[in-house]
């Protein structure tokens, strides 16, 4: 029985059963080692004290409380931190991304990220901008504790159905919902990088994994949608982070695509191109029954100085 499920919402009876089974299976010494390795990672967004889970509610010592939703996530994006009623991705873009990614088109990237996490042998991971959870759910299998946070509640609701061993949180990068110095690796895949907050939550010499579009990413798609194609500038992240992080490794992952019409529509809908492109150009492109593209991803692994 997986201990991390307890962090996701076991009741008292479930915990007793888990303890009994674990004692029988691994012995009392190993059991206490496992329990010691697990820790509460979440931080109260109001007073910044540790949150503990009891009876499907996260509480801090100052009695601020946050209920776990029926879908399995907790909302730590407090009202005073919101700038709009429904921040983040739209429901349409979330559903389009879920359909596109679940079809496996970006599987080479998912595999590359998982392999890197496995090689680092880390214990705690925070995925910033987890979205609908495609990458987060896969990374979780390589660590002891995994937290996925996104500002879009509709995305986290979808993510929470994928993997019950992830602690799914609605939250903001401006105040990451985890405690100081408790994370081995922060990941940011196609998401903003709140550098100071990442520095706060990372352990000494912790890692930051950044994934961003490489120069050639979806070039044919952008060429069809826009009169002028502006190149992606992945190197800007190296320049941005060089003061507080050492660049450990950088590499590119290519994913050649042959998209049927439905997948093409999903791809457009899940990107900013959906609202940046002129409607007539988007409609013309979506008439294609098939489209050949190359997805190209730039990956950076940084280490906190």
What does each of the following model-derived ranges do?
Residues 174-185:
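A short acidic, Gly/Pro-enriched loop at the edge of an enzyme's catalytic core
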């Amino acid at each position: 029985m997986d201990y991390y499920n307890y962090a996701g919402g076991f009741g008292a009876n479930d915990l007793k059963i888990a303890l009994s089974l674990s004692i029988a299976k691994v012995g009392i010494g190993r059991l206490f080692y496992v329990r010691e390795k697990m820790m509460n990672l979440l931080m109260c967004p109001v007073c910044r004290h540790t949150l503990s889970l009891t009876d499907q509610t996260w509480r801090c010592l100052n009695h601020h409380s946050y209920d776990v939703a029926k879908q399995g996530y907790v909302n730590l994006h407090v009202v005073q931190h919101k700038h709009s009623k429904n921040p983040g991705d739209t429901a349409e873009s979330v559903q389009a991304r879920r359909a596109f990614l679940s079809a496996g088109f970006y599987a080479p990237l998912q595999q590359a990220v998982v392999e890197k996490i496995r090689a680092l042998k880390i214990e705690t991971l925070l995925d910033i901008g987890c979205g609908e959870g495609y990458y987060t759910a896969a990374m979780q299998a390589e660590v002891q504790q995994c937290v996925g946070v996104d500002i879009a509640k509709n995305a986290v609701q979808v993510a929470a159905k994928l993997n019950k061993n992830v602690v799914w949180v609605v939250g903001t990068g401006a105040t990451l919902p985890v405690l100081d110095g408790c994370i081995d690796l922060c990941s940011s895949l196609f998401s903003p990088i709140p550098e100071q907050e990442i520095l706060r939550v990372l352990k000494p010499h912790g890692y930051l994994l950044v994934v961003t579009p490489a120069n050639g990413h979806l070039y044919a798609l952008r060429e069809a949608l826009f009169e002028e194609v502006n190149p992606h500038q992945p190197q800007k992240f190296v320049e941005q982070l060089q003061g507080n992080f050492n660049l450990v490794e950088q590499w590119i992952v290519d994913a050649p695509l042959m998209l049927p019409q439905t997948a093409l529509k999903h791809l457009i809908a899940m990107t900013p191109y959906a609202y940046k492109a002129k409607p007539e150009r988007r409609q013309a492109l979506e008439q294609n029954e098939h489209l050949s593209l190359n997805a190209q991803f730039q990956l950076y692994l940084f280490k906190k100085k």
